[in-house]
Amino acid sequence: LFKNGAIHPKKILTRFKENKEDVLVTLNRQGQLNLVCRKVKFTFFNFEYDIEHPVEIEESIFIPSLLDLAAMKAFALGMRSKWKDYMDLYFILKDHYTISQVSEKAHLYFGDLYSEKLFRGQLNYFKGISFEVLLHLSFLP
């Protein structure tokens, strides 16, 4: 979910409590709030880049397009190596977009902070990946 501007952890937690939800805060630091509610992990993150979010879901939720999400994940690989990002990128690159298309969009959003050469290298380098969130893919052979 995307919101323009800074996140406000107290307001977020108040909204959960108003809805009588039990919440476990796992991280609360400048620009980021991680919590667990109903066994679902949420990350609220102050993302300093202006990303379009034109896809509307249920008249009140707006998210980026799949290509924009792929560009964000490509950029994120340079800062963190999360298994879930590799999995998401696997399916996006396999079924929807090329590395060049993702890179073009990432360069549009992140400019010289993004490197297609680095991204291609990261797709082939698995040392240091965080497997904290393992996906159970029973539909894969």
Regions found by a protein language model. Give the residues of each.
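Compositionally biased terminal segments of proteins
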Residues: 1-141
